[in-house]
Amino acid sequence: MARGPGPLGRPRPDTVAMPKRGKRLKFRAHDACSGRVTVADYANSDPAVVRSGRVKKAVANAVQQEVKSLCGLEASQVPTEEALSGAGEPCDIIDSSDEMEAQEESIHERTVSRKKKSKRHKEELDGAGEEYPMDIWLLLASYIRPEDIVNFSLICKNAWTVTCTAAFWTRLYRRHYTLDASLPLRLRPESMEKLRCLRACVIRSLYHMYEPFAARISKNPAIPESTPSTLKNSKCLLFWCRKIVGNRQEPMWEFNFKFKKQSPRLKSKCTGGLQPPVQYEDVHTNPDQDCCLLQVTTLNFIFIPIVMGMIFTLFTINVSTDMRHHRVRLVFQDSPVHGGRKPRSEQGVQVILDPVHSVRLFDWWHPQYPFSLRALLLPIPWGQPRV
């Protein structure tokens, strides 16, 4: 049953909309006077009405100006507390504001004190420790194993500087040299008197004399278990081939590619770094730094196009069609491939070697890496084998 509009047919009076609880009260400066200051303007008022729990600055300033005008005083002549006390008005209006300002100042002082303390602690840490002379580090370096040189150089700058000296590398060579060591002529003691390329020569000699280093290179198989990925985006510096006559009735052919690997600094986009002292630049000189040699031996001669100066972008090793040998595929392009993109074979030069007998990769310190530049620059006509 529908209900009527009200008793005796009279319409109901409109209900008055009540303000929502918890909503902030809007303040107007012209409404602030001694007669319009409400309980909601004080700190102990209902927090549901005034969420801040403190008197608004606008209200306090308006009341302050009104009190001063009633007393006939200028704002710049009499302090606020005196004007309020002279007018007989309570000064509790600004008490909460003063308390908040004092609290903010206290927080700021604690923050500044904490920063000073942390800065002082950091300075103490930076100044902690003792700096030993270079002779101490040079003496300790005489007991360092070759495989621990990197860790030793990371102790401090003085330890790193010691590893840059000619005395360090000369003592390391003498410590591991033996009379029965099988060394090439360029790595003999009489050839170690020159400072130029001393570090590189000592490292090469350790792979002949030092057993842990020699054991590393003796385990390399004829065909690597996985395709080497360190040659990606390397630049081909040289290429040559030679005929190998062995126990087989038919000779084999050895194709050599010398690559210059991309510098680790370029990979990490880091142009700076520690450089050896100027007086030891000759000791650290190494023309073959970041270079390696890819050596592929095939059962017959294969024509190879000119790839010198190009970027090596793809290297795959698969099973040959006869299922008895391997097949090597090399792709060279004019520019490197970045961002994990796959190179397109139709855009570059493709080299296919099949059938392949062995694939070996030699770093610059490997005993089988060609050291003499004369051996690398043998005149070989392109497309014709040299017998």
Curated annotation (Swiss-Prot):
Membrane topology: Single-pass membrane protein
Transmembrane segment boundaries: 299-319
Annotated stretches, region: Disordered: 1-20, 99-126
Keyword Coiled coil attached: no
Record GO cellular component, one term: SCF ubiquitin ligase complex
GO BP annotations listed: regulation of protein stability
Keywords, ordered alphabetically: Membrane, Transmembrane, Transmembrane helix
InterPro entries cross-referenced by the UniProt entry: F-box-like_dom_sf, TMEM183
SUPFAM superfamilies linked: F-box domain
Subcellular localization: Membrane
UniProt main location, coarse: membrane
UniProt record similarity statement: Belongs to the TMEM183 family.
Protein name (Swiss-Prot/TrEMBL): Transmembrane protein 183
Gene name of the encoded protein: TMEM183
